[in-house]
């Protein structure tokens, strides 16, 4: 059995190094891919305690887990918030009675004129619709 930790910030593979350099716990698609390669199609258990992070990195991790040839078990040990909750939808879930899951609309910070704000709003709406597919697939609702 291979254990994979999704702890700390979910970050892109390209920015993972800065978190590592500062000693800040983070997970990226490249970390998950290495673990999946090492699992070689065998069952894996993903242990989650994360407040979330980068939506696109999280979606990439979700897709990697869904495409894994072996069974994927999810254990939620603490906080499972934001994009981490989407990652949790990629396998069979068990949740500690002391754990929490938090789901919310996609958010960002933006600046610019009204055109920039309208564009940002459209990007957020599309991202909301995209990630809601993971919840729908998992729950059938």
Q: Which residues does each predicted region cover?
A:
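Terminal-region recognition feature
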Residues: 1-141
């Amino acid at each position: 059995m291979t254990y994979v930790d999704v702890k700390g910030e979910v970050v892109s593979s390209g920015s993972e190094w800065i978190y590592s350099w500062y000693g800040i716990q983070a997970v990226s698609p490249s970390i998950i891919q290495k673990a999946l390669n090492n699992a070689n199609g065998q069952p894996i258990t993903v242990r989650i305690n994360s407040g979330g992070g980068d939506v696109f990195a999280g979606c990439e991790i979700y897709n990697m887990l869904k495409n894994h040839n072996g069974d994927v078990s999810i254990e939620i040990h603490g906080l499972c918030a934001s994009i981490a909750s989407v990652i949790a939808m990629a396998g069979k879930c068990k949740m500690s009675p002391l754990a929490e899951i938090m789901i919310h609309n996609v958010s960002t910070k933006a600046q610019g004129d009204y055109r920039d704000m309208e564009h940002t709003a459209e990007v957020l709406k599309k991202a909301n619709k995209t990630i809601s597919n993971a919840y729908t697939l998992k729950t059938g609702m």
